[in-house]
Each structure stands twice: as structure tokens, then as C-alpha cells.
Amino acid sequence: MNKYWLSGIIFLAYGLASPAFSSETATLAINGRISPPTCSMAMVNGQPQQHCGQLTYNVDTRHLFSSPVKGVTTEVVVAGSDSKRRIVLNRYD
């Protein structure tokens, strides 16, 4: 019976220790290019404006979502509990 206990302890110790000593490695390759931003935001006379290339669009802060340019979605978010402060977020598709 002592042999069975000893072999059980050895197999249990080996089974618990093998994940600690094993390691897996992987390689991640990302291919692509970085392009300069195509749009920017600016505050002009207290009103947010979106500049995309040579074009300028006024952002309507009364609506939550606005898409004046294809591929760019502008979202106006209220900052915290203060209704006067807003954050303008641009998302690019």
C-alpha cells in the first residue's frame, strides 16, 4: 500500500508541476501602414468645427451622433454630471 501512496504522490506532484515549467511562445506580426489623420476638431467662436482636408463642418451639439463625412462619426458626450461641459469624440471607419 505504501508503494501506491508513493507513486500517487509522485504522479500528483509531476502533474501539478508540469504547467509551472512549460511555456508556450508565439509571434505576432502586424502588417500595415500609419496614415496621417484626415480630420481634426477645433473650437471656433464657442462652436466645435470638424476640418476634413479642405472642408469645414459645424458639429451640431444638439444631436448625439453626426456624420458629415463618410467614414467619420462624431459623437458629443456630456462630461460627468455637468451639462455645460461636453466631449467631442471622432471615430474613423
UniProtKB/Swiss-Prot annotation:
InterPro entries: Uncharacterised_YehE (IPR020386)
Signal sequence, renumbered to the chain: 1-22
Pfam annotation, one family: DUF2574
Keyword Signal attached: yes
Organism superkingdom: Bacteria
Keywords: Signal
UniProt key word Signal: yes
UniProt protein name: Uncharacterized protein YehE
Upper taxonomic lineage: Bacteria, Pseudomonadati, Pseudomonadota, Gammaproteobacteria, Enterobacterales
Gene name for this UniProt entry: yehE
